[in-house]
Amino acid sequence: MKIFAYGIRDDEKPSLEEWKAANPEIEVDYTQELLTPETAKLAEGSDSAVVYQQLDYTRETLTALANVGVTNLSLRNVGTDNIDFDAAREFNFNISNVPVYSPNAIAEHSMLQLSRLLRRTKALDAKIAKRDLRWAPTTGREMRMQTVGVIGTGHIGRVAINILKGFGAKVIAYDKYPNAELQAEGLYVDTLDELYAQADAISLYVPGVPENHHLINADAIAKMKDGVVIMNAARGNLMDIDAIIDGLNSGKISDFGMDVYENEVACSMKIGLVKNSPDAKIADLIARENVMITPHTAFYTTKAVLEMVHQSFDAAVAFAKGEKPAIAVEY
């Protein structure tokens, strides 16, 4: 049996070598190149392909992969919105993803960023860099004094709620599919409008499905408290970034944190320097002292990388054996 992997990063290699040592009977080959119509031929002779990329898995790419006899595709990440499922269905692709690799990684990151926004650490860091040790006017706020609205109470959202409880914050939550334990605690509000009206800070943990596109838009922001803090480490398309910028300009939004961006594949968050980005909004946001940006690295811990590699390769082997792994994508 042979597995071919695309887009293997240097930081993934230790986890891959660990997996190979535990599975010596499996032949593994890989490249740092991403899966494209041109690179699909590299997988010829393999039973499964393991991938991770923000580039789309287009009809052309899937056709090229199927033409070299590979129709088992195992993603090392959770998102599947960049797959042409019509083409995948046409070629009978088996697809898996890694829906749960480390909820703690993303939840911790988002809560740390929210805490930093409340304590105005970016402004303080800028002052320190200028050798300015004066306190004012960078007064912070305590997490325990905030009502924090959590939108989405899946694996990550629930970890975030536990962290918030540790801080002593009042937590309210909204989810179309409530968790029974959280419901018993009385944390849920009935509508997003209720959450918007009550929350001092809002953090999102919902998928980037079409119904959630620009969930946070001008209408939603207008319903929020004045001076609301918004943190998004879920999916970039949840934010209408123009509405966010307008909210920051008006002061309706006091602080904003994001780890994901709607156009991140095309901008410098993925491909290089900010000055080379085709999207001027990134430079605008980065320059603001009340905005904190990370380049889609909320997940990026040693534990998460290990799980993403190990689970995806395990699924690739299962597909090659004609089995259905627990993390197979139903489509």
Curated annotation (Swiss-Prot):
Record EC number: 1.1.1.28
Domain of life: Bacteria
Reaction(s) catalysed (UniProt annotation): (R)-lactate + NAD(+) = pyruvate + NADH + H(+)
Class in the EC hierarchy, top level: oxidoreductase
UniProt keyword terms in alphabetical order: NAD, Oxidoreductase
Disulfide bonds: none
Pfam families attached to this UniProt entry: 2-Hacid_dh (PF00389), 2-Hacid_dh_C (PF02826)
InterPro entries assigned to the protein according to its UniProt record, in alphabetical order: D-isomer_2_OHA_DH_cat_dom, D-isomer_DH_CS, D-isomer_DH_CS1, D-isomer_DH_NAD-bd, NAD(P)-bd_dom_sf
Positions annotated to bind NAD(+): H155, I156, D175, V206, P207, N212, A233, A234, R235, D259
Active site: R235, E264, H296
GO molecular function: D-lactate dehydrogenase activity; NAD binding
Family membership: Belongs to the D-isomer specific 2-hydroxyacid dehydrogenase family.
Quaternary structure (record): Homodimer.
Full protein name: D-lactate dehydrogenase
